[in-house]
Amino acid sequence: MKALHFGAGNIGRGFIGKLLADAGAQLTFADVNQPLLDELNKRKSYQVNVVGEQARVEEVKNVSAVNSGSPEVVELIAQADMVTTAVGPQILARIAGTVAQGLVTRHQQGNTRPLNIIACENMVRGTSQLKQQVFAALPESEQAWVEQHVGFVDSAVDRIVPPSEAGSTDILAVTVETFSEWIVDGTQFKGQPPQIAGMELTDNLMAFVERKLFTLNTGHAITAYLGQLAGHQTIRDAILDPAVRQTVKGAMEESGAVLIKRYAFDPLKHAAYIEKILSRFENPYLHDDVERVGRQPLRKLSAGDRLIKPLLGTLEYQLPHNNLVTGIAAAMSYRSEQDPQAQELVELLAKLGPKATLAQISGLPADSEVVEQAVSVYNAMQDKLAH
């Protein structure tokens, strides 16, 4: 199996790329970080530190790398059996043109073997969004052929992969937690789905996408935002603070009540899933900084993301949401000199005030009860910081 993976960052190397290589794929990474690409091509392998109760080092072998902007990428798409991405939602749109070129070349070469493309991003139905962007870049005459021979497979991915430790001398080494989950929509493949250990097929992907978004992502973000307010440096320090933990767990239970109602999840199993996630946040081997996890607050406060989407579910089913609201207020309080969205958030708050800012970012009606509630919690947080 020939596989091309866009994004040779920590998630690409430590999660998706690793599973593909472990499955025996002939794997090429595409990225723009030239020193990283040179090192991958020189060594053809790298090390993954899997940390948890039993830490171990696993070697990923037989890999190569190309620059995402090079003609080689187009040729690789024309020949691949599988294309995956872990580039972040913002960059996904930028690779659509390259993917479209590769598909046109594939058609010209008469390659009718099925190709499956899977975007492994923190977004809902990311591959379907990529497909729209690819089709916008395709000549109309090519679209029917692509529709027939290329599967765009949506997925849900979950593995905590913090940035490399400062002072680490090996630019290829990556640290990951033991837990990983890669769930793909089995109904969207062209041809037989490939056998890859660690990739699970489902015919009910949205349940898994929302379970992960409403639990792991919601919990992780709120831990970061409340952790920063309480003066904690890492996710572990924050989640071990009883006050933070109580709100985070409460928020995950509130979003969980939406999932139980919407997808008929087993309440006991979902409670166990929440406990599992809390224990992952406590992992002493993952030094995950609250400022990093809180990055991009405008995106995280948007209507389809980890804070507002579960809140909208509680409104739809008339369920409690006090802890989610506290999390939203904490997100509005996030500050970072390094993050452009944090800077923009501060400017919006100064210009519009909290009520209009939250309404603008989230799409919630400014005069709604829930916005009033979030603003009141936010103001109380700001008063506390001022004293």
Swiss-Prot record:
Belongs to the mannitol dehydrogenase family. It catalyses: D-mannitol 1-phosphate + NAD(+) = beta-D-fructose 6-phosphate + NADH + H(+). The lineage of its organism: Bacteria, Pseudomonadati, Pseudomonadota, Gammaproteobacteria, Enterobacterales. One of its GO terms (biological process) is mannitol catabolic process. This is Mannitol-1-phosphate 5-dehydrogenase. The gene is mtlD. Its EC number is 1.1.1.17. It is an enzyme of class 1 (oxidoreductase). Keywords: NAD, Oxidoreductase. GO terms for molecular function: mannitol-1-phosphate 5-dehydrogenase activity. Gene3D superfamilies: N-(1-d-carboxylethyl)-l-norvaline Dehydrogenase, domain 2, NAD(P)-binding Rossmann-like Domain. One of its GO terms (cellular component) is cytosol.
